[in-house]
């Protein structure tokens, strides 16, 4: 596994005074000497506590976990490997070796699978349903069974992170990273980990409905360039289905009750036609994307061949 001297532990935080001290201590006890706490402007003393326990503390320029991660890696980390965890005490520092080991085996990104060993009470039933639905949807769109794309326990090379196109500000950062890894064929491993219940006295910053909606929208938005057939096809299918249902309603009203609905009939035809066009556009976009990827593969192969000749 990577030498500890080549690893920075990244802990994005916001008002985690109840847990950050023990979290930093655990990673220091695990042998890490560079622990970066990237704080989003905590008002409960998180920064002071982290500093007292030996962490390097930086305040991000704006709010949100996504901004914290991007700013930390791009501006405050220069080591080759990054081990990222939450500062809420739900991840075990003693499992750092399992997280880092795949990076020595050719993988560039590692995701900790919380569902492999989840402590009772660590995740609400609503959050479990949302996580499972997100993971299922991700696998359908991107064809990669990453198991737990919303996990906050990650290990990755700094070089691979710099290749990702990331823009999410909040909790959508994990989804965005997973999508980018799948899109760019970055070798990604999934490692079973233990997920603990939050320590008593600490409060989560996650809002299930609000943040869940943001995550779903981010996942769907990213499908536009990763799987356009799904993106346009799903909208087209919905539009076409709506048009067909309207047509059935108009037909029944006309033949059974003799009531005409000319305006609804026009709307039905328009909705159905739009649906068909969107599906066709999705098929064409998917074809163009496949051709684009083939061209990129050829260019990379030629570059490797010429590089070998040198």
Positions of the model-derived regions?
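Active-site acidic Asp-centered loop
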Residues: 40, 83-87
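Acidic metal-phosphate-binding loop of nucleotide-sugar-dependent transferases
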Residues: 89-91
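Acceptor/aglycone-binding surface of glycosyltransferases and processive sugar-polymer synthases
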Residues: 58-76, 81-84, 93-171, 175, ...
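Donor nucleotide-sugar binding loop of glycosyltransferases
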Residues: 16-19, 42, 65
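A conserved acidic beta->alpha catalytic loop
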Residues: 39-47
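Short, acidic, metal-binding catalytic loop of nucleotide-sugar glycosyltransferases
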Residues: 25-34
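N-proximal low-complexity "stem/linker" segments adjacent to membrane-targeting elements
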Residues: 1-26
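Hydrophobic helical membrane-anchoring modules
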Residues: 2, 176-310
């Amino acid at each position: 596994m990577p030498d500890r001297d080549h690893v920075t532990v990244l802990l994005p935080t916001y008002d985690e005074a109840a847990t950050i001290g023990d979290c930093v201590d655990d990673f220091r006890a695990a042998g890490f000497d560079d622990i970066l706490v990237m704080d989003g402007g905590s008002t409960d003393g998180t920064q002071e506590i982290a500093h007292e326990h030996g962490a390097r503390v930086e305040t991000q320029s704006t709010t949100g976990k996504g901004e914290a991660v991007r700013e930390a890696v791009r501006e405050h980390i220069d080591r080759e490997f990054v081990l990222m965890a939450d500062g809420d005490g739900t991840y075990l520092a003693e499992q750092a070796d399992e997280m880092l080991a795949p990076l020595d085996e050719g993988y560039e990104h590692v995701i900790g699978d919380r569902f492999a060993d989840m402590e009772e009470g660590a995740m609400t039933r609503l959050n479990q349903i949302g996580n499972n639905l997100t993971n299922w949807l991700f696998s359908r769109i991107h064809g990669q069974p990453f198991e737990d794309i919303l996990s906050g326990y990650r290990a990755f090379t700094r070089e691979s992170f710099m290749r990702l196109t990331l823009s999410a500000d909040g909790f959508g950062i994990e989804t965005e990273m997973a999508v980018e890894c799948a899109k760019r064929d970055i070798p990604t491993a999934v490692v079973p980990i233990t997920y603990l219940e939050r320590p008593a006295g600490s409060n989560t910053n996650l809002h299930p409905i609000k943040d869940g909606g943001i995550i779903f929208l981010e996942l769907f938005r990213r499908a536009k360039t990763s799987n356009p057939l799904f993106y346009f096809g799903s909208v087209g299918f919905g539009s076409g289905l709506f048009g067909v249902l309207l047509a059935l309603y108009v037909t029944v009203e006309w033949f059974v009750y003799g009531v005409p609905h000319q305006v609804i009939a026009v709307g039905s035809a328009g909705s159905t036609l739009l649906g068909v066009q969107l599906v066709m556009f999705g098929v064409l976009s998917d074809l163009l994307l496949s051709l684009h990827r083939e061209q990129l593969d050829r260019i990379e192969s030629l570059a490797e061949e010429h590089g070998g000749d040198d």
